[in-house]
Amino acid sequence: MSTTPTIPTIKLNSGYEMPLVGFGCWKVTNATAADQIYNAIKTGYRLFDGAEDYGNEKEVGEGINRAIKEGLVKREELFITSKLWNNFHDPKNVETALNKTLSDLNLDYVDLFLIHFPIAFKFVPIEEKYPPGFYCGDGDNFHYEDVPLLDTWKALEKLVEAGKIKSIGISNFTGALIYDLIRGATIKPAVLQIEHHPYLQQPKLIEYVQKAGIAITGYSSFGPQSFLELESKRALNTPTLFEHETIKLIADKHGKSPAQVLLRWATQRNIAVIPKSNNPERLAQNLSVVDFDLTKDDLDNIAKLDIGLRFNDPWDWDNIPIFV
């Protein structure tokens, strides 16, 4: 097996180790996913962050299983994340959704399973539409179910006990929701995944969560960049972080790319990152973000960029008040 970069890990409260740098599967096309995952494993990636809602878990699984079959990696060396979508929050539907994920990935277990959003949409049978996305069984109209988050969480805890999930966690949760969930949970969330970039830094949330012993993964590390292809008006009207003078100056000083600076800004504070790339050179670059340190001045200057600008807000879907 070829020499691959050694990626630092975060020790989770569940006892498992999660790589600090991974490969994000959001918006990876069905046509390219298997090859991209396979090539990422060859490059040295071991954490793959997927979700039911991404609609590409079959192809992601093909890439993973090809690499395992060829001896590039063992299953236990990989850290595979998936996420429970909003239509499957009712406890009686949680295992059905997980089984679909495991079947698509062609794996016996996932290392981490997150509640994707603290929102319960109306259940949609898998045979009717999968992944359902925003479909709630009635055209473009949103419909919801009265399912408390703790009920969904208890169903996930049972699946940990059954050996189908190693660690469970949450995504897009606020501090108050986390505070409440911890008080009813038997198994504490191992990971919180949040939108995290210099325009949206959330320092108080990060301080609270890390002190509570919960690891953090940041998504959309490049800020508006992730949302340009979705034609988000907010993203289109925001200067890219790659071109921001502060980021460019820091990158030049360290002889690194702006992307590497943005990723190191997170990993240096023990926040995992999950960028993706089709480009082999950038794939390797994104993995090489632990071999330099930003100075206190660098960190202070990046801190000044925080404007509380969120690009992934369910209020834009149907006035869903998670972040209001």
Curated annotation (Swiss-Prot):
<dbReference type="Pfam" id="PF00248">
    <property type="entry name" value="Aldo_ket_red"/>
</dbReference>
<feature type="active site" description="Proton donor">
    <location>
        <position position="54"/>
    </location>
</feature>
<dbReference type="GO" id="GO:0032866">
    <property type="term" value="F:D-xylose reductase (NADPH) activity"/>
</dbReference>
<dbReference type="InterPro" id="IPR023210">
    <property type="entry name" value="NADP_OxRdtase_dom"/>
</dbReference>
<keyword id="KW-0560">Oxidoreductase</keyword>
<keyword id="KW-0119">Carbohydrate metabolism</keyword>
<dbReference type="GO" id="GO:0042843">
    <property type="term" value="P:D-xylose catabolic process"/>
</dbReference>
<feature type="binding site">
    <location>
        <position position="116"/>
    </location>
    <ligand>
        <name>substrate</name>
    </ligand>
</feature>
<feature type="binding site">
    <location>
        <begin position="171"/>
        <end position="172"/>
    </location>
    <ligand>
        <name>NAD(+)</name>
    </ligand>
</feature>
<keyword id="KW-0859">Xylose metabolism</keyword>
<feature type="site" description="Lowers pKa of active site Tyr">
    <location>
        <position position="83"/>
    </location>
</feature>
<keyword id="KW-0521">NADP</keyword>
<dbReference type="InterPro" id="IPR018170">
    <property type="entry name" value="Aldo/ket_reductase_CS"/>
</dbReference>
<keyword id="KW-0520">NAD</keyword>
<dbReference type="InterPro" id="IPR036812">
    <property type="entry name" value="NADP_OxRdtase_dom_sf"/>
</dbReference>
<protein>
    <recommendedName>
        <fullName>NAD(P)H-dependent D-xylose reductase I,II</fullName>
        <ecNumber>1.1.1.307</ecNumber>
    </recommendedName>
</protein>
<feature type="binding site">
    <location>
        <begin position="276"/>
        <end position="286"/>
    </location>
    <ligand>
        <name>NAD(+)</name>
    </ligand>
</feature>
<dbReference type="InterPro" id="IPR044486">
    <property type="entry name" value="AKR2B1"/>
</dbReference>
<feature type="binding site">
    <location>
        <begin position="220"/>
        <end position="229"/>
    </location>
    <ligand>
        <name>NAD(+)</name>
    </ligand>
</feature>
<comment type="similarity">
    <text>Belongs to the aldo/keto reductase family.</text>
</comment>
<comment type="function">
    <text>Reduces D-xylose into xylitol. Has a preference for NADPH, but can also utilize NADH as cosubstrate.</text>
</comment>
<comment type="pathway">
    <text>Carbohydrate metabolism; D-xylose degradation.</text>
</comment>
<dbReference type="InterPro" id="IPR020471">
    <property type="entry name" value="AKR"/>
</dbReference>
